[in-house]
């Protein structure tokens, strides 16, 4: 969770109480935040690079990143207990399986841009079919969010 006004953000999960996040880039896969899996390291580094580029092309750069299907080298794979073949299958940022029963089903971006005292937030989601092809895109924009004068309760 977080607070756009103060810039404070927290991470929590079913295994960890809310913990304040340091400023910077954080990445998440199916484990703890910033778990040093190859795809998490790749996402973190590429996101930092993407944020330094042209803002107008940011969403497309990020969707390209989320669509990467490179398999990590065996020596870099985590040992999560599913066996080496499954680790290989799960190692790309974008996962597809031969039978199409498991894999990436959507890629979602939440982009924020400060607009005076408020923010313009854009949520863009691409849905993928069983083969991994994009089948739909949805966009929702929140202009001037939160509304000027609104301050969340602070404990």
Where are these regions (language model features)?
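N-terminal nucleophile
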Residues: 1-155
